[in-house]
Amino acid sequence: EVKNIEYLAKIKINLSNNQNEEFDYLVVADGVFSKTKSIILSEEKNIEFNNSVALRGNIKNYEKEDISLYLGKDFHFVIYPVNQNKEFNFISIIKKNLKNVEISDVSLFNDDNFLKSLTNEIYNKTSVQLEGKIENIKSFPIFVSRSLKISSKKNTYFVGDALYAYPPSFAQGASQSIEASAEIFDDIKNNGNDYYNKRIKKIKLVNLRSKLNHFIFHLSNPIIVFFRNIILKILVKNKKFLELYLGKIYRN
């Protein structure tokens, strides 16, 4: 565990076992609760609970073979295949207002009654027959970054959730981490200094779309939902819209 960081001729890191290590470059990738980032920036963790809980599980022998997205009142879920053996992943984002004491209680998210309340919320609000089909169910509180904080220290790179944690409604967390890692490699290889400039632009694009998706997916007014569904059916077939909304994300 990192205890302290000094920027000398090289980057000197003091570890919890009292060992010291020196490096030319430091890549910080220890997640949304990054302690290393807090040490570098000399401030508390810049995160907040997103009033949402993620529910994950597995489904076997689901009738559809493609990726399925379902939108409901204050929740949405995705079902997608993971192999050719008709095994699927199930991921749902559910709006959930929790008290601080509940958020910090790790055991709550493994509690059978809590998990049952989450799954029942989905079962009761969708026509899709999922009851008894979802296995290995787990839940996690969702935390997002309050704001984007970068490092002015030399040869120091934040990446993944340690750099910025998005609302999970655009399926971009992992892919943005991979993309950022490639940019770090290029920056180091070419002795560049443009990593954060590129990341800031992309983070703004992804974050805006993530927040917009989250809002649209969780609409509850029946009239608004009716028109939302009609508009979405039109937009997903519109190449210009898809290029505008997705092209800037998937193409540098």
PLM feature spans:
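Conserved FAD-binding catalytic core of PHBH/FMO-like flavoproteins
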Residues: 3-128
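Conserved mid-domain beta->alpha element of the FAD-binding
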Residues: 27, 114, 136-217
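Alpha-helix N-cap/helix-start capping motif
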Residues: 30-31, 182, 221, 239
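Phosphate-coordinating loops and pocket residues in cytosolic domains that bind phosphorylated ligands
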Residues: 38, 197, 208, 246-247
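A generic structural signal for secondary-structure junctions
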Residues: 41-44, 60, 95, 189, ...
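Short terminal targeting/anchoring segments
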Residues: 130-135
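A charged, well-structured terminal subsegment
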Residues: 218-228
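C-terminal auxiliary extensions adjacent to catalytic cores
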Residues: 229-252
